[in-house]
Amino acid sequence: MSRVSSIFIKMGILYFVKTMDTRYWGGSAWQLFHLIAFKSKHPDDVLNQMKDVLPCKFCRASTTEFVAKHPLHPSGSGSPRADPGRWLYEIHNMVNNKLRTQCKEDPAVIDPGPDPTFEDVKARYMSLKPTAVPGADFLASISANYPDDPEPNQMATQRTFLHALREVY
């Protein structure tokens, strides 16, 4: 049985959230972002905000570094990096490569296994019909990690992300 690291009540609902454990919210986040990348008509804003809202500060730092080295170009620009689905696939592989390195040094880090092909990932998400709210665990972790007394820039980041998410969700 895993340990719950946060318990909170919002709008009368009791939540138990393993807020920093990427095993809890990681898969949920990737599913949400891959669905948006492949199925949304305008995914760029959400994908560009992804690095700023991850619940784990180490994940935010790594993803910010990966995105700086491999930015998403605007859709329709003709650049190979203008394909949001392919771009996210490449960012996801960068994360997996980092995890593979870390798991050799730290047995607590889970090896993500081999990367699937882009074609397999695209086929999966293009055909996926979610039976639950995509990204629910990820979004709950964001909520649980939101500071009680946020700085104005933190509020602006969250608002920008949630507004962009509303446009594609």
Whereabouts are the PLM-identified features?
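Aromatic-rich, lipid-facing transmembrane alpha helices and their immediate juxtamembrane interface loops
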Residues: 2-169
